Amino acid sequence: MNEHNLLIFCLKDNVSISEYTEMIDWAYKNIQSETVVEITENQIIEYQNRGLWRLVSEITDNWLFGPSEGDWLIDKESILAVKEKLQNSDFSTEPLVKNIIHVLEYAIKNEKTVIFHF
């Protein structure tokens, strides 16, 4: 697995794509977008071991145990709860988590779905 090919993202406000694979393609083509967070396999494992994904799982009922576990699509109803949970966690000051929170805030403001593509 490529060390830098895992993403947490939402589409930009001016982008309307309904096909899931096209959303993934868009994210890879727009990796520098403010709405795309690139995350390594090692980071996924580290945060799993530290309990970050458990916080998200408690809200979404989608359980992630490590890389290649599949994809999460976080619906609009859960995004606010996930954002608040992360902001109130011990992880909230870490740069990667700050970037994830930014994507969640953007998604809330622009009514977008957030995708965890692991």
Curated annotation (Swiss-Prot):
Entries under Gene3D superfamilies matching the protein: 3.40.1760.20
Domain comment from the record reads as follows: The shape and electrostatic surface of the DMP12 monomer are similar to those of the straight portion of the bent HU-bound DNA and complementary to those of HU protein dimer.
Q: Which InterPro entries has this protein been placed in?
A: DMP12, DMP12_sf
Q: What job does this protein perform?
A: Acts as a DNA mimic. Interacts with the DNA-binding protein HU and partially prevents the binding of HU protein to DNA by occupying the DNA binding sites on the protein. However, the relatively weak affinity of DMP12 for HU suggests that it may not completely block the HU protein-DNA binding, and that DMP12 is more likely to act as a regulator than a competitive inhibitor. It protects HU protein from limited digestion by trypsin in a limited trypsin digestion assay, suggesting that it may serve to protect the HU protein and improve the stability of unbound HU protein.
**What is the scientific name of the source organism?**
Neisseria meningitidis serogroup B (strain ATCC BAA-335 / MC58)
- Its family? Belongs to the DMP12-like protein family.
The protein depicted here goes by the name DNA mimic protein DMP12
Any GO molecular function = metal ion binding
**How would you summarize the oligomeric state and partners of this protein?**
Monomer. Interacts with the dimeric form of the DNA-binding protein HU.
Pfam family of the protein (one): DMP12
